[in-house]
From Swiss-Prot:
It is a peripheral membrane protein. F-type ATPases have 2 components, CF(1) - the catalytic core - and CF(0) - the membrane proton channel. CF(1) has five subunits: alpha(3), beta(3), gamma(1), delta(1), epsilon(1). CF(0) has three main subunits: a, b and c. NCBIfam families: ATP_synt_epsi, PRK00571.1-4. Signal peptide: none annotated. Pfam families: ATP-synt_DE_N (PF02823). One of its GO terms (molecular function) is ATP binding. Produces ATP from ADP in the presence of a proton gradient across the membrane. Keywords: ATP synthesis, Cell membrane, CF(1), Hydrogen ion transport, Ion transport, Membrane, Transport. This is ATP synthase epsilon chain. The gene is atpC. HAMAP family: ATP_synth_epsil_bac. GO terms for cellular component: plasma membrane; proton-transporting ATP synthase complex. InterPro entries: ATP_F1_dsu/esu_C_sf, ATP_synth_F1_dsu/esu, ATP_synth_F1_dsu/esu_N, ATPsynth_dsu/esu_N. It comes from Buchnera aphidicola subsp. Schizaphis graminum (strain Sg).
Amino acid sequence: MDFYLDIVSVEKRIFSGLVDRIQVSGSEGEMGIYPGHTQLLSIIKPGVIYIFHKNKTEECLYISGGILEVQPSVVSILADVAIRGIDLDRKRVVKAKKQAEEYFKKETTNVKKDDVLLEISKAIAKLRVLEIMDKFKK
C-alpha cells in the first residue's frame, strides 16, 4: 500500500508523488505516517522529514516548520521553508550557525535571543539532514 504525498513551500512544490510512509516532527513529537493513517492536522516543528519511497529508497528534507494534514489516501505538508537534503550547502549552513552562535553571545535582550536560538536550531536541523544524507551515500 501507499499514499500520495504533497510537500509545498511558500516558494514552490518540493515533492509530489506516491510513497510508502513518512516520518516527521510534529508538535507532539515524532510521527510515522503510514497508508490509511487516521485523519490528522498538526503543526510541524523545524527538523527532518524522512520520505520512504515505493522503490525502497529514502530521501530526507529540511523543513523550517509548517502544517501537516493527513487524509486517508493523501498527506499534505504546507511548509514555511522546505529544502531537499541534496540541495543543502554544508559550508553555508555551518557558517550561518557560527554567525548565529556569535550573535547569541553578544545579544542582551531575551526577545532577540529567542530569535537567534531559533536560527541556531534551524541550522542544527539542516546539519542533521546533511549527516543523514552522508549515511545514505554509504
